[in-house]
């Protein structure tokens, strides 16, 4: 017979969030980052952990370009916590680079994933909650 598991303590509680950005509007980018910060602050106040991945594709990939209007915020968030990841769609990056006739550099904080849409599917299938600001 298997014994019942004991209660989960707050320090063991982990929340997973996938944030979807496909809009080049700086207000949307800032809202996404505000949501990330608010979620992490809320759970930290309860002694719990929040692991977040921000996935950008399509026009939202501008969030990770060198001239991003939220570049400083992304750099700061990445330095503050390894529990926030930034994922960039390789499909979008390839198409934007082809259109520009040159490789478009992205922020070092953004890791390339083969497809932003597929990454969001994988995260949700893995138990992540989904948010599209």
Q: What do these predicted ranges mean?
A:
Residues 30-45:
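Histidine-anchored nucleotide/phosphate-binding helix
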Residues 11-24, 54-57:
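Acidic/histidine-rich, surface-exposed loop or edge segments in extracytoplasmic proteins
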Residues 50-64, 92:
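Acidic helix-start/capping segments at beta-turn-to-alpha-helix junctions
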